[in-house]
């Protein structure tokens, strides 16, 4: 375990993330430009695909970080049976949900019930599939829909704000089931689908297209919102949410509806819109 990961056990997660949020939304020219230039240089951010390629045109660091892409910079897989990758990033892990457990790293796993904050909500995904995608600081930070779905409920699960970088994934037990997260449940033509937005150290917020800012939310109680009857339908490939700094999204699918696309595995670099899995039609 690295020194940084060890320190995250004792660091004041909330205070540091609150400070990061204040900096991210600062419109002081010197502050925001220093942050933009530092992150661009350190992580090799490619602005040529951005709708606004001029790093000095962004009013805040957060505006830079949640930047839109040019039209056509990402296109969905042409196969109508393809469920799409929800974001740019890197596969942390993916595979079957076996006996209700989701693989995190060698020697590490957690239950779907822990992740979703509800054993009943987890039951339909037993023996299904999961994919965990890590968004690094250089990546496009909007999350899109793998498949067309109608929003049913969201569940805010309070928790810690550990780093979700590779070292933390290898060494922090049940990491994604311990960090603060927003669980989004959708109804689709094949049954339930869940997308889980996992918070992390220095993540200054998670926003959804239907409700705005969802994280940070203070308190220690699980909060559920019921959207049934609201008619919130998000089409395949449509934007769903965004991270106001890098983090992780986990997609859960029920059993018997899809097979994972060949060539995907842990550490695979992925792009929004490529095939994640393919429907088992007929």
Curated annotation (Swiss-Prot):
Top-level taxonomic group: Bacteria
Reaction(s) catalysed (UniProt annotation): a 1,2-diacyl-sn-glycero-3-phospho-L-serine + H(+) = a 1,2-diacyl-sn-glycero-3-phosphoethanolamine + CO2
GO biological process terms, semicolon-separated: phosphatidylethanolamine biosynthetic process
Pfam families named among the record's database cross-references: PS_Dcarbxylase (PF02666)
GO molecular function terms listed in the Swiss-Prot or TrEMBL record: phosphatidylserine decarboxylase activity
Pathway: Phospholipid metabolism; phosphatidylethanolamine biosynthesis; phosphatidylethanolamine from CDP-diacylglycerol: step 2/2
Record: active site: 88, 144, 247
Membrane topology type: Peripheral membrane protein
Keywords of this entry: Cell membrane, Decarboxylase, Lipid biosynthesis, Lipid metabolism, Lyase, Membrane, Phospholipid biosynthesis, Phospholipid metabolism, Pyruvate, Zymogen
Coiled coil regions in record: none
Protein purpose: Catalyzes the formation of phosphatidylethanolamine (PtdEtn) from phosphatidylserine (PtdSer).
Subunit structure: Heterodimer of a large membrane-associated beta subunit and a small pyruvoyl-containing alpha subunit.
Family, as annotated: Belongs to the phosphatidylserine decarboxylase family. PSD-B subfamily. Prokaryotic type I sub-subfamily.
Listed name of the protein: Phosphatidylserine decarboxylase proenzyme
Originating species: Xanthomonas oryzae pv. oryzae (strain MAFF 311018)
Gene assigned in the entry: psd
